[in-house]
A protein has these predicted regions:
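A generic secondary-structure signal marking the coil-to-beta-strand transition
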Residues: 34, 55-56, 72
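N-terminal short beta-loop-beta anion/metal-coordinating cradle
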Residues: 41-61
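Short amphipathic alpha-helical segments, especially helix-boundary/capping motifs
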Residues: 9-12, 59-63
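Rossmann-like NAD(P)(H) cofactor-binding subdomain of soluble oxidoreductases
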Residues: 52, 61-145
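Generic structural signal for residues in well-ordered beta-strands
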Residues: 26, 57-59, 143
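NAD(P)+-binding Rossmann beta1-loop-alpha1 motif at the extreme N-terminus of oxidoreductases
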Residues: 1-48
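A generic structural signal for alpha->beta connector loops
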Residues: 23-25, 56, 95
């Protein structure tokens, strides 16, 4: 399964290491010093026991350079989501799964931001609405991107 992690912070990095160690090719969208470090050294994570996990990843600042993915994990802070939603279109194909790994994203988040994900309903637990069955961090695309 081709996996792209959009956001290489603590959550995205942890998921990237776990998925790469499970044998999936992992790419990451990052910027600045984080992008340069990923390109030079791969993804590194210090475990609780002090050991270092290091896995190779493909890293770019431009999602279009990575192509369509089987799974896209969005692991950015909530204020960055509108920009990410517009930029991630080149990663999304008809069978791509989009998984959010962030806090505070209600099911209706994409309904009025414009772009390719306009109207997408996220299956999530939302205290202001009836909970969906998917769980707190699952994203489900209903219809074309």
């Amino acid at each position: 399964m081709k996996v792209c992690i959009y956001g290489a912070g603590a959550i995205g990095g942890w998921l990237g290491v776990a998925l790469a160690q499970a044998g999936h090719p992992v790419s990451m969208v990052a910027r600045g010093d984080t992008l340069r470090a990923l390109q030079a050294e791969g993804l590194r994570m210090r475990r609780a026991d002090g050991s270092l996990a290091q896995v190779p990843v493909t890293a770019h600042s431009d999602p279009a350079a990575l192509g369509v993915q089987d799974l896209v994990v969005v692991a950015v802070k909530a204020p960055g989501l509108p920009d990410v939603a517009r930029a991630m279109a080149p990663l999304i194909g008809p069978d791509t799964i989009v998984l959010t790994a962030m806090n505070g994203v209600p099911w209706w988040y994409f309904h009025r931001i414009g772009g390719p994900l306009e109207g997408t309903r996220l299956a999530s637990v939302d205290p202001g609405d009836a909970p969906d069955d998917a769980g707190p961090h699952a994203g489900t695309r209903h219809g074309p991107p």
